[in-house]
Amino acid sequence: MKLSLSVALSLAAATAQAATQFCDQWGSVTEGNYILYNNLWGQAQATSGSQCTTFESLSGNTIVWNTKWSWSGGQGQVKSFANAALQFTPKKLSSVKSIDSTWKWNYSGSNIVADVAYDMFLSTSPGGDHNYEIMVWLGALGGAGPISSTGSPIATPTVAGIKFNLYLGPNGSMQVYSFVAQSTTNSFSGDMRDFFTYLESNQGLSSDLYLVDVQAGTEPFSGSNAVFTVSDYSVSVA
């Protein structure tokens, strides 16, 4: 049977958009400007568990995906960070005009302890080691808490119209700033550049640092039959 060119192209497009699931520790798939990772970097801390991540679709710059997991043991230890990482050329903060993003997500499952967060990294050079980690937690579920030297926030800023508790602590050689939303935010639309602007103005962060990574996903600590669904995610660096 012969197919017209338009039908053939439509079938090819449908094939390209077919759901892709991966369950291996370092599994990933590249779609558009994103690399979607399973990233089970802390699975050795669990006494049992597993996780699979699925790419569902990409429309323009908007990616739809989910991850399903069950983890037990290793209380207080992160087991993974399934995330969508943006591919872009590192830029000095002084040259970054905007980091526009939208994110709609949902969680279901039993006894979930997890965070839902943007994870962004800064370096003194485009290809150098990470010096700063900037996290923006839209959800801190089941008592999940950020890295902190004191266990108490150093400030309570309002950024992008959301009230946060800001924490500071070390992660190896990096300094980690964690903005933790005071109320779970399942739908976000804003400019992530605002968080860096706040740190430059209030915490002495240098604008000479390079923005080298922008990721968004979930860090599970423990729970069962968890389903983290991202129905709308996009981000761009300009």
Swiss-Prot record:
Where is this chain's protein located in or outside the cell? Secreted
List where this protein forms a coiled coil: none
Q: Which GO terms describe its molecular function?
A: cellulase activity; xyloglucan-specific endo-beta-1,4-glucanase activity
Identify the GO cellular component terms for this protein. Answer: extracellular region
Residues of the signal sequence? 1-18
Give the reactions, separated by semicolons, that this protein catalyses.
Answer: xyloglucan + H2O = xyloglucan oligosaccharides
- Sites where a glycan is attached: 106, 171
Q: What's the EC number here?
A: 3.2.1.151
- Name this protein carries in UniProt: Probable xyloglucan-specific endo-beta-1,4-glucanase A
Q: Which organism is it from?
A: Aspergillus fumigatus (strain CBS 144.89 / FGSC A1163 / CEA10) (Neosartorya fumigata)
